[in-house]
């Protein structure tokens, strides 16, 4: 028996919340944990994290917003609108499914290196519906590390006998986030932060990657899904993940129609 809702922490920083919510999962269902998307820089840590990461961490529980919408940019308000639509679609699974922990930040081996791949740089969650026909996954990165562009997401709690359609939530990225790398494709020089740069960013959005796989549950859990490679210094297109510090992705798994026909 649980309270209908608990205030997990005043700390709404997405990175901190990932660790806090992982801890709560040992004793409480996500249906009672209140998770908020707050403004940035975060009021507790002054950390700046992407709006999508703040949403995706908060979505694994009772999600809400504590932002001044009047002061947000139009594209941020539109992003929030789409986030709410997505959350409502998957709310039953996100709030009442079975929560599984994968890798997590506390797994760190203590080396503290920002140059070498170490344990504790990733948090993975999977929430699976009671009938195991639907699941939602989170893959969250703490820090970018050079030459570690190839990541694998390992699902948990799926049925080994069900064939799933695994796919990501495709995003669009602001060209400002690439800084003066815009000049690698611009026909004329564009000064970073200039009016021209801002105008380009207003009208040109970069399409994110698409991950789309059909596989049985045992494959998704034990072999994992090799995600599209992250940006590694040069070359960006819709087959490359824009995955900077504190970036994350949500992945969705649904029973494949062909799997239903074979039962």
Where are these regions (language model features)?
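Catalytic cores of secreted or luminal carbohydrate-active enzymes
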Residues: 55-107
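Flexible loop/turn segments at secondary-structure boundaries
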Residues: 40-45, 66-68, 74-76, 144-147, ...
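Glycan-recognition surfaces
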Residues: 1-71
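Intrinsically disordered, low-complexity coil segments
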Residues: 42-44, 104-120, 177-179, 212-213, ...
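Carbohydrate-binding surface patches
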Residues: 111-161
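Conserved, mostly hydrophobic/aromatic
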Residues: 58, 137, 166
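C-terminal beta-sandwich/jelly-roll accessory domains of carbohydrate-active enzymes
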Residues: 144-263
